[in-house]
Amino acid sequence: MSISAQNPDISGDRQSGQDVRTQNVMACQAVSNIVKTSLGPVGLDKMLVDDIGDVTITNDGATILRMLEVEHPAAKVLVELAELQDREVGDGTTSVVIVAAELLKRANDLVRNKIHPTSIISGYRLAMRESCKYIEEKLVTKVEKLGKVPLINCAKTSMSSKLISGDSDFFANLVVEAVLSVKMTNQRGEIKYPIKGINILKAHGQSARDSYLLNGYALNTGRAAQGMPLRVSPAKIACLDFNLQKTKMQLGVQVVVNDPRELEKIRQREADMTKERIEKLLKAGANVILTTKGIDDMALKYFVEAGAIAVRRVRKEDMRHVAKATGATLVTTFADMEGEETFDPAHLGSADEVVEERIADDDVILIKGTKTSSAVSLILRGANDYMLDEMERALHDALCIVKRTLESNTVVAGGGAVESALSVYLEHLATTLGSREQLAIAEFADALLIIPKVLAVNAAKDATELVAKLRAYHHTAQTKADKKHYSSMGLDLVNGTIRNNLEAGVIEPAMSKVKIIQFATEAAITILRIDDMIKLVKDESQGEE
């Protein structure tokens, strides 16, 4: 039964019952259909043009959805879901949206057949818990003391669907080296890989294979003046977040002067205030000064005389990373509690050397040998902006995946292997339950097959046949003890056959799969619980008051 009526107490439209659910499911299907064709190693790219005409060409689910201006509230849930997956895992954003939309579609069919949403939700929750347990107990492969090979394979799998898949060997090595070089142990003795310390710089020219890894944090700006030294070693770095310019009096300040000479004194004092600040900096031992704001010519003169490097207009984000890597404190003002201006030498960070180098046509400041945590930079080369942006997105995903693999130490086979195994397992599980949840779990099992199906369709292969074969292998693996190794059988999309993906090196971190299932189920449940939608209309009478 569906009602769509004006309720006298509500200033707005109200829709409830099946109508709303169908509408929500349709909206989610529409979002999922947009990213569906970009899944997998042979997925296609999307060209997005925003309102000012900027073009983005990408294959990354999170980027596509972020740039779509989605109006529908239920579809927005999926967009946020992709962003969450991007933050938590870094890859698998497309999969998570497709799975969530498929779960919703199937749940909606069940509701139409008079199964109550609450039964479906509890069935989905049970299926999710069982899936995660099954992955962790039966499907994962421990990668003891990870050598480089599994890491490189994980990075290659992540890149396989991106623009740089042709050079995935080359880039996978770059990524793994970059992640391993920022390895650190925190106070609790845990080994962490802060990939925020990996700076990605994009420079036009040459080919993608001319990209390289630089030891040191690269800032995309040059020295503020030519007279400054090209190299400072050892470096004491001050990170500032304010102007080093002549302090002008604020607007509205009135100064009454009787003597014209007083005017000159005021001007002189304005200049001296900046000079004193610079002297305090240099006295504290700073020989590299980075600021997010500007430095005027008068201030530069003092730095040149002192033989220090000053860099202005550094990005705030870069500044935070440099401060973290060198042990510096980002200083926003010199004034202390009493209003006195001081600069504590403890705020300085230290590095072995700071040099200016030329990369492509741009001057770049490199901070090498940082004190607290090591920092590296990936210098990407490429033909144009679109290509460089897409390379950066691909490398971001790969860096996240390698980090997750190192931290969790477990991998699973890719190419639809996990989804098929879970599907077969959950179908069997559903038949052992005598409750209503049985139907929901069977639908959950079917919904997971959407991943191998879409992979096969995108590769222009016969999806029905391939998925049937794949399920047969996994059924054998789960019923016959001597055929356990079949559980890592997945799709080989180049040849359109089934192969053992663990041996073929198509692997992903286990946590990526677990998170996809958890997030997709939670999102589907959130949307499934909605059975009433009230769109409020702005009350005119209040506006007039």
Swiss-Prot record:
UniProt-annotated location(s): Cytoplasm
Keyword annotations from UniProtKB, A to Z: Acetylation, ATP-binding, Chaperone, Cytoplasm, Nucleotide-binding
Xref: CDD domains: TCP1_alpha
Task of the protein: Molecular chaperone; assists the folding of proteins upon ATP hydrolysis. Known to play a role, in vitro, in the folding of actin and tubulin.
Molecular function GO labels: ATP binding; ATP hydrolysis activity; ATP-dependent protein folding chaperone; unfolded protein binding
Pfam family, one: Cpn60_TCP1
Assembly, per entry: Heterooligomeric complex of about 850 to 900 kDa that forms two stacked rings, 12 to 16 nm in diameter.
Highest taxon in the source lineage: Eukaryota
Protein name, UniProt field: T-complex protein 1 subunit alpha
Keyword ATP-binding (UniProt): yes
GO cellular component annotations of the record: cytosol
Modified residues (N-acetylserine): S2
Family: Belongs to the TCP-1 chaperonin family.
